A protein has these predicted regions:
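Terminal amphipathic alpha-helical/low-complexity segments used for targeting or macromolecular assembly
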Residues: 1-64, 106-109, 131, 171-180
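Flexible, glycine/small-residue-enriched loop-and-beta-strand segment within the central core
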Residues: 58-59, 75-146, 171-173, 178-180
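A generic "structured core" feature
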Residues: 151-153, 157
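Acidic, glycine-centered active-site loop in nucleotide-sugar glycosyltransferases
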Residues: 164, 169-172
């Protein structure tokens, strides 16, 4: 059991080191800053996550660093990346359905074999353009742009950019219709 715990500890240290480098922190104080930043983000996310009031959820997400436009609506349990919220940009008139998820990073957290070059960390901005609708249960992965007035169908996994005025469906999501 100690070998497994050692692997978890090594992976945790590696994740912490990557986060410190990304934010420009170093040393013991940098490690402290990262932990405080994460705890703050987690608390604000938990408040937003289960809020039935969209305006409150949006204010909490903005406090975390998510860029959110005007007239947006977030349903309860919409999840926005915990580690890199500042890389998520949501433009005006966007709707996020319940249990939809937006990730600005992908990273195997506990498996050192995957982490050491076989499955590299990907950290990239996610942009949801004006008028887009992200339906319940949809997942938006890192580096994706969802086009203007596009609709992501329920349960879809978006791994590539979505053009403007389209409906996408499936895993992975593909365009099934243009909206005129």
């Amino acid at each position: 059991m100690s070998k497994y715990n050692d692997l978890i500890d090594d992976a945790t240290k590696l994740n912490e080191k990557e986060l410190m480098e990304y934010h420009g922190y170093s040393g013991t104080f940098g490690r402290f800053q990262i932990r405080i930043k994460y705890i703050n983000s987690w608390i604000l996310h938990r408040l937003a996550f289960s809020s039935a009031h969209s305006g409150f959820a949006i204010r909490m997400q903005k406090a975390r660093g998510v860029k959110i436009g005007k007239n947006c609506h977030f349903n309860p349990y919409a999840f926005i990346d915990l580690i890199y919220p500042e890389l998520v940009q949501i433009e005006d008139n966007v709707t996020l359905g319940s249990f939809s998820m937006i990730f600005a990073h992908s990273n195997p957290t506990a498996n050192l074999f995957l982490k050491k070059g076989n499955y590299p960390r990907k950290v990239a901005e996610v942009i949801i353009k004006s008028g887009a609708v992200i339906n319940p249960g949809s997942i938006i992965t890192s580096g994706v742009t969802v086009g203007k007035n596009s609709i992501v169908s329920p349960g879809s996994v978006v791994t590539q950019d979505v053009p403007d005025h389209c409906v996408v469906v499936g895993n992975p999501a593909r365009v099934v219709r243009k909206i005129e």
